């Protein structure tokens, strides 16, 4: 069996332990966050990324911007929906920077993104 990627480990822990346990968020909020990452994985699959090989460094600021554009163009999402998705990505990468301090700069580049 292949070893899981750092992204797979982080997103699994984030959705199952951190949001539900440590943050005690509602099931609907957790579902919204999960849906964001389902869409991100779909987008990355369309970009010919192998889902089981995605690493944290593969999700950079440029990719997030392309993802948000894809949501608008391909899925017809409004600016407010895109902001919800960006907020979920920001929250995840704030979590990642504490779990993987070596990723701090990478995470800060993503959490600095805003929609114009």
Which residues does each predicted region cover?
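N-terminal core-binding DNA-recognition domain of tyrosine recombinases/integrases
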Residues: 13-28, 34, 38-116
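Acidic, low-complexity proline/glycine-rich segments
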Residues: 1-8
């Amino acid at each position: 069996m292949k070893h899981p990627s750092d992204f797979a480990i982080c997103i699994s822990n984030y959705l199952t332990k951190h949001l539900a346990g440590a943050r005690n968020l509602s099931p609907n909020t957790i579902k919204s966050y999960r849906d964001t990452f389902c869409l991100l994985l779909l987008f990355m699959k369309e970009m010919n990324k192998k889902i089981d090989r995605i690493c944290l460094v593969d999700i950079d600021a440029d990719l997030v911007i392309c993802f948000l554009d894809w949501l608008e163009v391909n899925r017809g999402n409004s600016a407010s929906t895109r902001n919800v998705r960006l907020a979920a990505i920001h929250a995840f990468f704030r979590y990642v920077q504490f779990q993987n301090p070596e990723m701090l700069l990478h995470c800060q580049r993503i959490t600095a993104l805003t929609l114009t």
